[in-house]
């Protein structure tokens, strides 16, 4: 163990329900340059078109992340021994101004990126990923592994509104931040607005693995396809909790039945080990619609799964 690496509070010494909540019970930091991986909340759901409440996601995920321990039980990755990890607090948001929130979030992540820190974020609705991409993808477009029930490549909602949680990846592709040929979406399902709903994703070259295809392929073949698509370049992972069946993640804005199990999601994320990861997020945890903290626990657990991968990625580039 490196003695100068921040460590979580020990639950054998300080009970999980005690102390000030931070992600993974790690120390809080204000300077991203002090860290190699920064844990960040984005408490904003101004792009939500159905059930609001994801603005409360970061706080509840912080609470439930107290259940995470120090070492991954399968991979044996000990992220806090590999790199310096800490809680960078929440990105600034404006709850009554969508465009100002996008600017504020982008500015925050530009500082994180300039410091060379890999961000691991908790939303917030899925629109928060767009300003993160604006900060991380300016130098070169990123590849992406995207877990979701929805493609989030729609164009406009409610007239001519280009910014909702259903549009972030269309905007990111249009702005040259996301490479569609290095993008794979896993778990897509549910009814659609029109037969052409997936036309943009299909025509620009995104590899879409609908839930039905995932069931046929299984975890290993799906992972092989995902790794083929993103290749060796810089890659971002975006995990929307509604990729899970509502039985496992009821507290979300736009639930869809017929989703994957929490174990399948864990296996898929673990299978991304070794990719050139530059950041990740967990979004759409909506505590007002949660049951017994189940979805917040999903968010915290998937955050730890992603942290283990990002820690290895940061250690390789150190």
UniProtKB/Swiss-Prot annotation:
InterPro entries: Agmatinase-rel, Ureohydrolase, Ureohydrolase_dom_sf, Ureohydrolase_Mn_BS. One of its GO terms (molecular function) is metal ion binding. GO terms for biological process: putrescine biosynthetic process from arginine, via agmatine. Its EC number is 3.5.3.17. Keywords: Hydrolase, Manganese, Metal-binding. Gene3D superfamilies: Ureohydrolase domain. It is an enzyme of class 3 (hydrolase). Mn(2+) 1 binds at residues 126, 148, 152. Mn(2+) 2 binds at residues 150, 240, 242. Binds 2 manganese ions per subunit. Its cofactor is Mn(2+). It catalyses: 3-guanidinopropanoate + H2O = urea + beta-alanine. Belongs to the arginase family. Agmatinase subfamily. Homohexamer. Catalyzes the hydrolysis of 3-guanidinopropanoate to beta-alanine and urea. Possesses low activity against 4-guanidinobutanoate. Has no activity against arginine and agmatine. This is Guanidinopropionase. The lineage of its organism: Bacteria, Pseudomonadati, Pseudomonadota, Gammaproteobacteria, Pseudomonadales.
């Amino acid at each position: 163990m490196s003695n100068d690496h921040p460590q979580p509070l020990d639950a054998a010494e300080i009970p999980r329900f005690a102390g000030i909540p931070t992600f993974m019970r790690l120390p809080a930091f204000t300077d991203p340059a002090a860290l190699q991986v920064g844990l960040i909340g984005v408490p904003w759901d101004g792009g939500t078109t159905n059930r609001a409440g994801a603005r409360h996601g970061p706080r509840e995920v912080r609470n439930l992340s107290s259940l995470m321990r120090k070492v991954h039980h399968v991979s044996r990755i000990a992220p806090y021994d590999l790199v310096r990890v800490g809680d960078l607090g929440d990105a600034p948001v404006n709850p009554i101004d969508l465009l100002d929130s996008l600017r504020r979030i982008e500015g925050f992540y530009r500082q994180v990126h300039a410091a060379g820190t890999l961000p691991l974020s908790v939303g917030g609705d899925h629109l928060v990923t767009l300003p993160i991409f604006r900060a991380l993808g300016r130098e070169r477009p990123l590849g992406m592994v995207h877990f979701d029930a929805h493609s989030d490549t729609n164009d406009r909602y409610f007239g001519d509104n280009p910014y909702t949680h259903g549009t972030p990846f269309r905007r990111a592709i249009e702005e040259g931040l996301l490479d569609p040929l290095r993008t794979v979406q896993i778990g897509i399902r549910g009814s659609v607005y029109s037969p052409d709903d997936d036309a943009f994703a299909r025509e620009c070259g995104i590899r879409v693995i609908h839930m039905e295809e995932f069931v046929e392929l299984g975890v290993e073949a799906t992972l092989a396809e995902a790794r083929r698509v993103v290749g060796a370049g810089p890659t971002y992972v975006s995990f929307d909790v509604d990729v899970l069946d509502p039985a496992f993640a009821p507290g979300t804005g736009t639930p869809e039945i017929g989703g994957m199990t929490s174990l399948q999601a864990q296996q898929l994320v673990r299978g991304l080990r070794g990719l050139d990861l530059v950041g990740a997020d967990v979004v759409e945890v909506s505590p007002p619609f949660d049951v017994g903290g189940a979805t917040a626990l999903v968010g915290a657990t998937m955050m730890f799964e992603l942290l283990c991968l990002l820690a290895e990625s940061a250690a390789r580039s150190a």
